[in-house]
Amino acid sequence: MRKLPAAASAAALALVLSACGSDGAEPETVSEGPLPDTFAIATYGTGTSTYADTSAVSEALTAEEGMSIRVVPSDTGIGRIAPMRDGQALFSRGGDEYIYAFEAEYDFAVPEWGPQDIRMTWTPTAPHSVMSLSGSGIDTFSDLRGKKVPWATANPSVQNKMTALLEYGGLTWDDVEAVDISYGDQAEGVKNGQVDVVYQQVYGSSLYELESQHDVQWLELDPDDEAAVERMLEVAPSTFVGSFSGGPAQEEGEETTALMYTVPVITYAETSAEAVHDLATALYGNFESYEDATPTTSGWGLDEIQSVPTQVPFHDGFVQFLEEQDMWTEEAETRNQELIDRQEQLRTAWDEYRESEEGAEPDHESWTAWKDENLA
């Protein structure tokens, strides 16, 4: 059985990259002062809708604010967090690796990582789902039994969501054939028979390309199937059931139910509140210039973003912005402080855990067990 690995100112990235020379100089960060005119943001690989809308937002900020933003693509969670940690990008936008980095889970439960002091700076939401070939016999999630299901390599966020959707269908990885494949190669894998389905954000360009060559269909979630939804949310608590339209394999005006969750822009806590506030202000102030740029950029709007933290705290600069918009509640403040306190507890606990292991290499399973026993 497979184990479950359970806008921004464009200038910041370029600024950071210019500081990472071969002379070993310390990369620049923005620990104080405003958002720089040049910066980078790491995100999913080309061909994904996350890359497309991140690029579209970056281009809009470049045009409207004179920023210079570089988008750095990667198909892996580590590949999207590492540039930010190493000073090659000021921001990152990806899947649940921001949660795993915060908690030091899965690929981050290793000596060179441990708990990361991550903060959320903007929280757009987006739909994700599973697509199959029409006539394949895969019409529902329970039909995945015995089928070749993608196991997105080095991408615990996607692995988690696919695990949750299998649970929705009453299945586990023991019931399917797990196929190692990168997130960005899934659509091509369906074409050549390597996998039977693809899981992605629903507006990815690779899905439109797949639709142009084959008859395809979406596997739908039923929000009224409370038991199935509960099983799914038990595995992926940051998600909810919503609907989307205007995607591949849809007629005009058709709506399809899917898995929804935030795909946030993140940074480290050390980034200045002024810089993050500048980013939030720019994203809000220029929304009309990118709202219709891609099918998912509407999810960057103020009425669509997540306004209460759940598993990772919001940055002080983002909190300041939400307060100015009368969107920051007492409930949100209480939860945010709980999460900030948890990060402090996690970093202390990580050191204690490493000492208790007496030189043994840390790993996800033993660290998770240690947390369950020693942290509330």
Which residue stretches match the model-derived regions?
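Bacterial N-terminal signal peptides that target proteins for export
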Residues: M1-S9
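C-terminal motif of bacterial Sec signal peptides marking the signal peptidase cleavage site
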Residues: L15-A19
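Bacterial signal peptide processing site
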Residues: G21-G24
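Bilobed "Venus flytrap"/periplasmic-binding protein-like clamshell domains
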Residues: P36-E64, I69-R70, P127-N192, S205, ...
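Pocket-flanking alpha-helical
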Residues: D53-A60, R70-E112, V130, I138, ...
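Pocket-lining segment of extracytoplasmic ligand-binding domains
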Residues: D96-Y98, A104-A109, S136, W173-D175, ...
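Ligand-binding clefts/hinges and TM-proximal coupling segments of bilobed small-molecule sensing domains
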Residues: K148-A164, T239-Q306, T310
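An extracytoplasmic/periplasmic, membrane-proximal ligand-sensing/linker region
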Residues: V202-W218, R231, Y284-A376
